[in-house]
Every structure is written in structure tokens, then in C-alpha cells.
């Protein structure tokens, strides 16, 4: 008789566990709404130092600017999972409210549709908590939602304020923000470079090696003085002593490297 009881108890345990798992899967979106596990600091993968975070958003995507490295943290933000699927790349994290994708992928971190952060911003916060300092966002600059494009441009300033650098990689252009720092372009750079003040005023602005140079100038967010500058076949530099600048340039020039913070420019 004790043996029969043991068998019954074991069967009951298995049944209960399976039932709980089914409930967890079916109502996982409610659990994530309240507990939001991505607010926790997620440990880095064993032997994988992640300084670059590559995020795929739901906007239009053409091709990669550079290969994704094994050490990159790859995040699919909602509909950005489609792009990764086409590339045959398995993301480290899948998150969002999935109103764009239309279904909830297995293992995804689910958020409510009504929230303060966009799915892209959720991904950025993830990357920052993982210690990433460089962010590349695909599907973030081209698409039918102008409001999301503007939100993504603002997120570049958010990254700069948190000591990180970010790039929106579009099908034709790349956007990035520098704060109290400088960037340089090689003499092979071509096309247009537009420079905007993204927050109030920017002082001590220097544009060199461009068709329209500027020395110790001031740019304001209420007047687009820096629009449509041009590379000239010389090495070019954009720097700002105090403030934040949004740079928009041709995609063929690749990702630039921020050079200095609070430097004596």
C-alpha cells in the first residue's frame, strides 16, 4: 500500500507541475506586467564580454553595416525579430509588447502595450544594465512611424547622457549624437553631413575639413544652421565643448568613433 501511495503522489506532482507550466505560459504577459524581470541586472554570459549592443527594431531594414560579433549582445525589440530571423541570427534577448510582431515568441520578455518606454528604449535600458557602452540600432530610422523615428533620435541623447554612444543605422543614413566630445571622419568620407543641436544650445562647435567650416561657433535647437554640409576629400572633424550635437551622414561612411569627453577642444 505505501508503494501505491508513492506512485499516486508522484503522478500528482507531475500533473501539478505540468498544469502550473501551462498556466505560466498562457498568462506570462500578466506576470511580466507586474514583475518586469528585466529591471534586474542580468549577469553576463560566461566568457562573453559584451561592450556592443546590437538592437533590431521593427522599422525598415536593408542590410548590416558590419558583421555581428560573437561578443555582441543582440536584442530583438518586438517586430525586429523578423529581421533577425531573415538573417538566421538567434538573439540573446527578445522583448516588447509584440503589437508589431503579432504574436508572442517563446522565451520572450513581455511588456504591456500601455507603458512609458518604447520597445527600443526597453532594449537600450537592457544593454546599459549589461554594461554595454556602444549601441547600434537597425530598423530604427526608416519606416512608416515618424513618431518612433523621432523617439529613436531622442534615445541617442539618452545614451550620450549615460556615457554611451549610439547609432541609428538606416537604409541610407546613419544618425549619432556626441556630447562634449568630438568625432573624426577619414579623407575617404563622402556625401552629406548635417549637424544639429539637439538640446538647447551647443557652444564651442568646430567643423573642420568640411565645405562649410565653423570655428568656436554656437548652434541652437531652434535654427538648423548645420544642415547639408559636405565632405571635401579631407579628414573632417566635428567637436563641441559644451552641449550635444546630432549628426546625420551617409551610411557608406560607416560608424564613427567618439574621441573625447569634456576635452579641451
What residue ranges belong to the model's regions?
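N-terminal beta-strand-loop-alpha-helix module at the start
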Residues: 50-104
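Short Gly/Thr/Asp-enriched flexible loops that form oxyanion-binding sites at enzyme active sites
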Residues: 146-157
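Aromatic (phenylalanine/tyrosine) cluster motif
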Residues: 13, 27, 32-35
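Short phosphate-binding loop-to-helix
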Residues: 109-130
Amino acid at each position: 500500500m505505501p508503494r501505491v501511495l508513492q506512485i499516486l503522489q508522484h503522478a500528482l506532482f507531475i500533473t501539478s507541475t505540468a498544469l502550473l507550466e501551462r498556466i505560466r505560459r498562457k498568462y506570462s504577459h500578466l506576470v511580466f506586467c507586474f514583475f518586469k524581470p528585466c529591471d534586474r541586472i542580468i549577469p553576463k554570459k560566461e566568457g562573453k564580454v559584451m561592450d556592443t549592443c546590437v538592437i533590431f527594431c521593427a522599422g525598415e531594414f536593408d542590410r548590416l553595416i558590419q558583421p555581428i560579433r560573437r561578443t555582441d549582445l543582440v536584442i530583438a525589440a518586438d517586430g525586429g525579430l523578423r529581421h533577425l530571423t531573415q538573417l538566421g541570427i538567434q538573439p540573446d534577448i527578445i522583448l516588447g509588447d509584440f503589437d508589431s510582431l503579432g504574436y508572442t515568441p517563446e522565451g520572450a520578455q513581455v511588456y504591456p502595450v500601455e507603458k512609458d518606454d518604447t520597445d527600443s528604449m526597453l532594449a537600450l535600458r537592457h544593454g546599459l544594465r549589461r554594461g554595454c557602452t556602444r549601441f547600434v540600432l537597425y530598423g530604427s530610422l526608416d519606416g512608416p512611424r515618424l513618431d518612433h523615428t523621432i523617439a529613436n533620435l531622442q534615445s541617442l541623447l539618452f545614451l550620450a547622457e549615460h556615457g554611451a554612444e549610439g547609432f541609428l543605422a538606416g537604409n541610407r543614413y546613419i544618425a549619432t549624437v556626441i556630447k562634449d566630445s568630438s568625432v573624426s571622419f577619414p579623407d575617404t568620407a563622402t556625401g552629406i553631413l548635417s549637424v544639429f543641436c539637439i538640446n538647447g544650445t551647443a557652444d564651442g562647435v568646430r567643423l573642420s575639413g568640411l565645405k562649410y567650416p565653423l570655428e568656436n561657433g554656437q548652434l541652437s535647437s531652434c535654427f538648423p544652421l548645420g544642415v547639408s554640409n559636405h565632405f571635401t576629400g579631407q579628414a573632417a572633424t566635428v567637436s563641441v565643448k559644451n552641449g550635444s550635437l546630432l549628426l546625420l551622414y551617409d551610411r557608406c561612411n560607416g560608424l564613427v568613433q567618439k574621441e573625447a569627453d569634456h576635452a579641451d577642444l
